[in-house]
Curated annotation (Swiss-Prot):
Notes concerning its domains: The histidine box domains may contain the active site and/or be involved in metal ion binding.
Pathway terms, separated by semicolons: Lipid metabolism; polyunsaturated fatty acid biosynthesis
Segments for region (Disordered): 1-23
Name of the protein in its database record: Omega-6 fatty acid desaturase, endoplasmic reticulum
GO BP of this protein: unsaturated fatty acid biosynthetic process
GO cellular component term of the entry, any: endoplasmic reticulum membrane
Record EC number: 1.14.19.-
Transmembrane segments annotated in the record for this chain: 56-76, 84-104, 117-137, 180-200, 226-246, 253-273
Chain location of the short sequence motif Histidine box-2 per the record: 141-145
Organism expressing this protein natively: Brassica juncea
Top class in the EC scheme: oxidoreductase
Length: 384
């Protein structure tokens, strides 16, 4: 959901599944970032404080309305209706708060305003409210953007090589195993990433915990701000403790806890599907460069949720190319650069539930083509 006007861009022509799964080119593109930037109207790079706040305030108003309805009217409902009302609240509040998360994420990219202090203040407040350590995310996520598609240096959703698949992997390569893995991924994946860097790149030099200021993820200039992030999380946890003490644990779980689980599940789903697709290459150090890595991502279609999520879902390619660009210009930018990107642009309109299952089935590990000339280019495979 958003406030303010936004140009409407006609959706990409519908592709057949064969076209959707066709590999994107892995050769050095015949265009440069500078040429892409020249094709974009200059106003698309301008950040507006009133406009940025309008989207945030709108999301807060909607979330507050849901909270008011749940606390005021749900206690009056007979039990059969309350069993329907609460799941509706959880789903609606979860997706709206995901939109709030997206705006806070934009602050970490310095795409909210022209003032870094304002971006950091807004991002710290709203990421902390959603139990995300703002500066920890800001710095590790920045490294993800700097190293997207690199098997050695990317920060998250780094695919395994076939040789790294555990012995029990083949026993999970079935419908039941995939169901279990997806359930764990969408319920525990987000906190496990923060606490233990699960799905992140390995750090042999030390324990990679996003809450630990001395973790090898960060450099010396960043460590003090990790303490600030941790303080923000502790402050929110204390507030939740006081709320639970006053209103009851059940109230806190129903009004905040379950919607937060929905937020976490959508964040894992969105990022997983943005970077996992049978058509996308990954590169080792012999082939990787920033532009090809940034193009190793895919735009998806979540229907009406595209707007609720501030188009982070269907403009992700443009976001990786120009991460300081405000989200409310991303549709226009995508339209401007698609003719230049050509086959390097990947859009998949497969319904997200179907795509989630397909990717879990098809994208188990990466390996180079046996007959391919480029041994440093890796593609997804599922044959164990």
């Amino acid at each position: 959901m958003g406030a303010g006007g936004r140009m409407q861009v006609s959706p990409s022509p519908k592709k057949s599944e064969t076209d959707t799964l066709k590999r994107v080119p892995c050769e050095t593109p015949p265009f440069t970032v500078g040429e892409l930037k020249k094709a974009i109207p200059p106003h698309c790079f301008k950040r507006s404080i009133p406009r940025s706040f309008s989207y945030l305030i709108w999301d807060i108003i909607v979330a507050s309305c849901f909270y008011y309805v749940a606390t005021t009217y749900f206690p009056l409902l007979p039990h059969p209706l309350s069993y329907v009302a609460w799941p509706l609240y959880w789903a609606c509040q979860g997706v709206v708060l995901t939109g709030v998360w997206v705006i806070a994420h934009e602050c970490g990219h310095h795409a909210f305003s022209d003032y870094q202090w304002l971006d950091d203040t807004v991002g710290l407040i709203f990421h902390s409210f959603l139990l995300v350590p703002y500066f920890s995310w800001k710095y590790s996520h920045r490294r993800h953007h700097s190293n997207t598609g690199s098997l050695e240096r990317d920060e998250v959703f780094v695919p395994k090589k076939k040789s790294d698949i555990k012995w029990y992997g083949k026993y999970l390569n079935n419908p039941l195993g995939r169901t279990v893995m997806l359930t764990v991924q969408f319920t525990l994946g987000w906190p496990l990433y923060w606490a233990f860097n699960v799905s992140g790149r390995p750090y042999p030099e030390g324990f990679a915990c996003h809450f630990h200021p001395n973790a090898p993820i960060y450099n010396d200039r960043e460590r003090l701000q990790i303490y600030v992030s941790d303080a923000g999380i502790l402050a929110v946890c204390y507030g939740l403790y006081r709320y639970a003490a006053a209103q009851g644990v059940a109230s806190m779980v129903c009004l905040y806890g379950v919607p937060l689980l929905i937020v976490n599940a959508f964040l894992v789903l969105i990022t997983y599907l943005q970077h996992t697709h049978p058509s996308l290459p990954h590169y080792d150090s012999s082939e990787w460069d920033w532009l090809r890595g940034a193009l190793a991502t895919v735009d998806r279609d979540y229907g009406i949720l595209n707007k609720v999520f501030h188009n982070i879902t269907d403009t992700h390619v443009a976001h990786h190319l120009f991460s300081t660009m405000p989200h409310y210009h991303a549709m226009e930018v995508t339209k401007a650069i698609k003719p230049i990107l050509g086959d390097y642009y990947q859009f998949d309109g497969t319904p997200w539930v179907k795509a989630m299952w397909r990717e879990a089935k098809e994208c188990i590990y990466v390996e180079p083509d046996r007959q391919g000339e480029k041994k440093g280019v890796f593609w997804y495979n599922n044959k164990l």
